[in-house]
Amino acid sequence: MASGTRCIGSFRGDGFEIFKFAKEATGFTRYRVLDLEQRAREQLAAQPIDAAVISFGANDAQAVFANGHLHPLMSDGWKQVIGDRIDGYVKALRSTGAVVYWIGLPVMRDPQLDAEMQAMDAFYEQHMRRLGVPFLDSRPLTLDAQGRYNAYLPDLKTGKPVLMRTGDGLHMIGVGYQRLTNAVASDLRRYAERARRESGRPVPAATPSGEAR
């Protein structure tokens, strides 16, 4: 499994192998710095995977230069270039038979940036639907009870406020990323159990809490 988010802790001890392919400060608008599709194909050639959990967007809130033209953020040209790059990236991930999940972006502290992220997420969700890729809308999971940004959010088990965000108002800390990926983690466990049964491999025994170990 490749992780583009920080959900690694959700799977420790569950019989999963985790390969972190993520690279900071990259995105679909930055192919002059790093071609994500090419990098993915190189990584997959060295390490095939069964599932990929990916999330992009925070670094792509900018214009994209392609084919001699500068396309403003969310313009038709931007959507065409980014859409084509997403197609190639997902195709590369699926080339090993991997299932792909896309996790949307959390709410941002800065209102203007948050509006841009919402517009981009709407584009990504529509694109993932066309590709048949499950899309997790993480925004509801990152709003407080008043529907606003808050660095502290209630723990899903205890209800007590827990620090989830870093000081920049953009990123999340480990427990915050795990909050976003719980639904995907559950789906991946079911997928892994089906795959193990079909291959004749034993399924890890369930713990008293019901989680596979």
What residues fall within each predicted segment?
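Active-site segments of SGNH/GDSL-like serine hydrolases
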Residues: 55-61, 65, 89-121, 140
